[in-house]
Amino acid sequence: MKHLLITLSMLTICLSCNTVRRDYERLMGSQVIFPETLQKVERQDTLPFVTNKDNAHMVIYYDSTQCNTCAVSKLGDWDSIIDDAKSIYEDIDFVFIMSPTKSDQKKVMRDIGINYSDYNVAFDDSGAFSQSNPQIPQDNRFHTMLLDKNNNVVLIGNPLYSNSIWELMKEALMNIKNNNGQFVAN
């Protein structure tokens, strides 16, 4: 019985690693679509969300399985990353996409409008971002990604929680800067 449990545990770990690898390979290099139904939150109003098509984008996506009100309260944590990234490549936009549950939508909208309207927050009340980008896994480790100006994923990972991701992001930004907004693999 003990050997069976060990074998099953090892099999589960191996399958999990294969899933993560497959999710990574499916997302890396794919093109991300910003659906027209996204709304920009400004104060107490919503406006159509429009991206600058000539800029690179750092997308930070919070789906309905995550605590969106918690995410809103932590937007200020991104300030130093945003400032440092823009000092490397000024043509980068940080896009925070919030897709809260129906029950949290009003609170999230209010919190963004009152406290965080200076951030580039897109509100997705219909789940259109997820539907338009089926290559993005549900695993939230894949919900922070750097896109070049063509909206191709060039880096996956959150630089807030990993110095190695931050170093890779700086290298990728230099690559994008040196190649007119496009990422060129070495």
Task: Go through the PLM ranges and name each one.
Residues 64-69, 101-103, 160-162:
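Short acidic, S/G/P-rich loop/turn micro-motifs used as interaction or catalytic elements
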Residues 71-114, 129-131:
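Structural microenvironment flanking redox-active thiols in thiol-disulfide oxidoreductases
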Residues 141, 146-186:
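Thiol-/selenol-based redox modules, centered on thioredoxin-like
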Residues 17-52, 72-74:
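N-terminal "domain-start" segment that seeds a small globular fold
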Residues 1-17:
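Sec-dependent bacterial lipoprotein signal peptides
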Residues 108-141:
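Short, internal strand/loop/helix patches
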Residues 48-72, 78:
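Short active-site neighborhood of thiol/selenol oxidoreductases, capturing the structured segment around
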Residues 58-60, 94-97, 146:
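Structural beta-sheet core signal
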